[in-house]
Every structure is written in C-alpha cells, then in structure tokens.
Amino acid sequence: MAFVTRQFLRSMSSSSSASAAAKKILIKHVTVIGGGLMGAGIAQVAAATGHTVVLVDQTEDILAKSKKGIEESLKRMAKKKFTENPKAGDEFVEKTLSCLSTSTDAASVVHSTDLVVEAIVENLKLKNELFQRLDKFAAEHTIFASNTSSLQITNIANATTRQDRFAGLHFFNPVPMMKLVEVIKTPMTSQKTFESLVDFCKTLGKHPVSCKDTPGFIVNRLLVPYLIEAVRLHERGDASKEDIDTAMKLGAGYPMGPFELLDYVGLDTTKFILDGWHEMEPENPLFQPSPSMNNLVAQKKLGKKTGEGFYKYK
C-alpha cells in the first residue's frame, strides 16, 4: 500500500510540475521600446541569445544611432571573447545583428510579440500613455514589462487591462556586462507571468532576483539612501568627499566611493529618484532632498557626462 501511495504521489507531483511548466510562456519574440542606452543594451543581450528582437523608437535617426552603438559593443565583446578565433567573432556579431530589427511604429509590431520591455524616459504619464495604446494592439498572451528604476510598477500597469501580465524588469547599466535583473511582481502579477520572466532572464545569461513593488526595489532602495547619506556627511562638514570615497573603498571594499558613483550614474538621475520617493513619503528622513546635489543639478553639473559634478573631469 505504501509503495502504491508513493507512486501515486510521485505521479501527481510530476503531472503538477509538467502542468505548471506548460502554463509558462516561452519568450522568443521581444519588442524593446526605447533606443537609449538601456533599451539598446536590453535589445543587444536579447538578440545575442537568439531571441527575435524589434527595437522601437520615435525616429529612424535615433534607431540608426542605437544600432550602430549595438554593433560597436558587439565587436568589442567579440574581440575579447574570440581572441583566438576572429572569424567566430565576426559570425557572432553577424548572427546577433540578424536577430535585430528596428521600427518607429510600436503598434504594428506588438501584435506578434511575446514580451514588450519599455525603457523610455522616467515619466509616469508617458509610460501610461504608451502602454494604454499598446494594450489595444498586443496579443492576448503578450507580457508587458517596464525597466523603470524609480516608479512603482502598479501605477504603470494600471493603464492597461493586463495587470496580471505586467511586471517590472529592472536591468542595470551597462546591460551587456551587468548580470543582475530585478523581477518586480505586483499584487496583480500572475505566477505564470513571473515565472516566464524569470526563465527569460536566465536565457539572457542574467541572474534574476525577485522583489515586491516597493519604491526602489532592492538595489536602489539600499543604494540611494547610502549615497545621499554620504552627501549629508559632507554637507555637515564631517569629512571631505575625497576622504569619504577613500574610506568606503578601503574600509568597506567598495569599488567606487559614493561621490565617484554619483558622478558616474548622473546627479540628475539620483535626484529624480530621490524626488519621486520624497513626493510619495515626504516625512521619511531617508528621502529628504540634498541642497548641495540640487545646486549642482541646477547648474547642469551632472557628473562625468557633463565634465563636472562633485568632481571635475577633463
């Protein structure tokens, strides 16, 4: 009797696992909205892993620039990866680019896609308008995902009729190099959608981690308050920015100090995230604005990209 019971339970378990696996969507066709640094990076890694990818932006000029950047990135990767076999490197670049196409008409391509990844400017109104429009044209099974780093996924998903097929996919810059992807599950995101996205991230060679739809998710929720506290330490005159950076590199083992990292990321980017959180939770001491950072942003001193931030760059 015990043997029969074990066999029955094993059979039920196998059937259940097979059924659950069958429910997941195998993502083969990906549409990336936004040809900027993040969107182009996401498109590149998806194409490099054999997915059919369409990169969408407003103009052909933007897309041409994006595709050129992707090609240059692939050539650099091929040179490092295929040092002993340049021909294999050329084939890798050619094969990846053959999986990638571009379009200025998102509505015309989403009807046949498995996944839409949005990587446009961090503006809730624009994201809502985009997804509300795409929702009318996308296939029933299509999953929507936002690469937002600061907005809540629920507030973006509410513009659609597919909240159960909506989640966050937060990649990190530079996308081809950074292994981490935060998969954000809202209260409405189905388990099928979540598992499909986790599997997709793994096919990209990434390491997915899961987080609820909380401000900043995991990395930014820990990182931004740390960066701002370093700025406050400097604002109070407790230590110089140089000594703070040195202390965190030599004492905590961080590869970059907080001021170096702020300049690398862009002061405007960090300010945008902090301002959004402060608006949501004005009494939270972690989210209070930084006068010195606000002053630098007002002067357009945004970090390395403008030649000056907390430090000056030649």
Swiss-Prot record:
GO biological process assignments: cell differentiation; fatty acid beta-oxidation; negative regulation of insulin secretion; positive regulation of cold-induced thermogenesis; regulation of insulin secretion; response to activity; response to insulin; response to xenobiotic stimulus
Catalytic activity annotation: a (3S)-3-hydroxyacyl-CoA + NAD(+) = a 3-oxoacyl-CoA + NADH + H(+); (3S)-3-hydroxybutanoyl-CoA + NAD(+) = acetoacetyl-CoA + NADH + H(+); (3S)-hydroxydecanoyl-CoA + NAD(+) = 3-oxodecanoyl-CoA + NADH + H(+); (3S)-hydroxyhexadecanoyl-CoA + NAD(+) = 3-oxohexadecanoyl-CoA + NADH + H(+)
Pathway annotation from the record: Lipid metabolism; fatty acid beta-oxidation
InterPro entries assigned: 3-OHacyl-CoA_DH (IPR022694), 3-OHacyl-CoA_DH_CS (IPR006180), 3-OHacyl-CoA_DH_NAD-bd (IPR006176), 3HC_DH_C (IPR006108), 6-PGluconate_DH-like_C_sf (IPR008927), 6PGD_dom2 (IPR013328), Mito_3-hydroxyacyl-CoA_DH (IPR052242), NAD(P)-bd_dom_sf (IPR036291)
UniProt binding sites for NAD(+): G34, G35, G36, L37, M38, G39, D57, E122, K127, S149, N173, K305
Any one GO cellular component localisation term in the record: mitochondrion
Gene3D superfamilies: N-(1-d-carboxylethyl)-l-norvaline Dehydrogenase, domain 2, NAD(P)-binding Rossmann-like Domain
Free-text description of this protein's post-translational modifications in UniProt: Succinylation at Lys-81, adjacent to a coenzyme A binding site. Desuccinylated by SIRT5.
SUPFAM superfamilies: 6-phosphogluconate dehydrogenase C-terminal domain-like, NAD(P)-binding Rossmann-fold domains
Domain of life where this protein originates: Eukaryota
Enzyme superclass (EC): oxidoreductase
Positions bearing N6-acetyllysine: K75, K81, K87, K125, K136, K179, K185, K192, K202, K212, K241, K312
Phenotype upon loss of function: Deficient mice display reduced levels of plasma glucose, elevated plasma insulin levels, increased plasma 3-hydroxybutyrylcarnitine and increased urinary 3-hydroxyglutarate. Islets isolated from knockout mice have increased amino acid-stimulated insulin secretion and higher sensitivity to leucine-stimulated insulin secretion. Increased body weight, reduced litter, smaller testes size and weight but does not affect the epididymis.
Stored PROSITE patterns: 3HCDH (PS00067)
Function: Mitochondrial fatty acid beta-oxidation enzyme that catalyzes the third step of the beta-oxidation cycle for medium and short-chain 3-hydroxy fatty acyl-CoAs (C4 to C10). Plays a role in the control of insulin secretion by inhibiting the activation of glutamate dehydrogenase 1 (GLUD1), an enzyme that has an important role in regulating amino acid-induced insulin secretion. Plays a role in the maintenance of normal spermatogenesis through the reduction of fatty acid accumulation in the testes.
Subunit structure: Homodimer. Interacts with GLUD1; this interaction inhibits the activation of glutamate dehydrogenase 1 (GLUD1).
Protein name: Hydroxyacyl-coenzyme A dehydrogenase, mitochondrial
Organism annotation: Mus musculus (Mouse)
Gene coding for it: Hadh
